[in-house]
């Protein structure tokens, strides 16, 4: 049976911590979809389309990874698209407390047997979050080594564009 996995987040921006989880998950499953969640409550740095394009470009070398976006319940998206695994990344025990609660709720909502698999972020990336990256970048700090090169270029270009306004 082909395994179709889903890894979700807002990815605004995609960080090296996200990349680490995606790269490792891509080796475990036949197909991996990076599901970009639309969250109107969050002020986004990049549009959904920009995030999707950046993720697709960054993940090209992996071969079996694609990006998509969705809104609404994760369980609805999983059931509609036939995923058998939901991958979640963990940085700390605080992440685990939240993620286990969500996994248990989702298990009630999934139509079929869908497993939630937790992958620990590598230690070098455990302190990285999209929020921290955005804050450091907005204050003029270096985010090199915190995000993939494609994302770094896009963030620098966005900053330059905003300075010109």
PLM features: residue spans?
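Nucleotidyltransferase catalytic core that binds NTPs
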Residues: 1-165
């Amino acid at each position: 049976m082909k395994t179709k996995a889903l890894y979700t987040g807002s990815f605004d921006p995609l960080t090296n911590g996200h990349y680490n989880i995606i790269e490792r998950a891509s080796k475990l499953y036949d197909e991996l979809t990076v599901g970009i969640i639309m969250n109107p409550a969050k002020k986004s740095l990049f549009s959904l389309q920009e995030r999707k394009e950046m993720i697709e470009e960054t993940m090209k070398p992996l071969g079996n990874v694609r990006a998509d976006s969705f809104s609404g319940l994760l369980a609805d998206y999983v059931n509609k698209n036939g995923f058998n695994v939901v991958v979640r990344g963990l940085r700390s025990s605080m992440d685990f407390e939240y993620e286990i609660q969500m996994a248990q709720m989702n298990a009630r909502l999934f139509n079929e047997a869908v497993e939630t698999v937790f992958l620990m972020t590598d230690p070098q990336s455990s302190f990285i979050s999209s929020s921290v990256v955005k804050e450091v970048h907005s204050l003029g700090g270096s985010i090199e080594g915190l995000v993939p090169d494609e994302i770094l270029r896009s963030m620098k270009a966005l900053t330059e564009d905003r300075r010109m306004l």
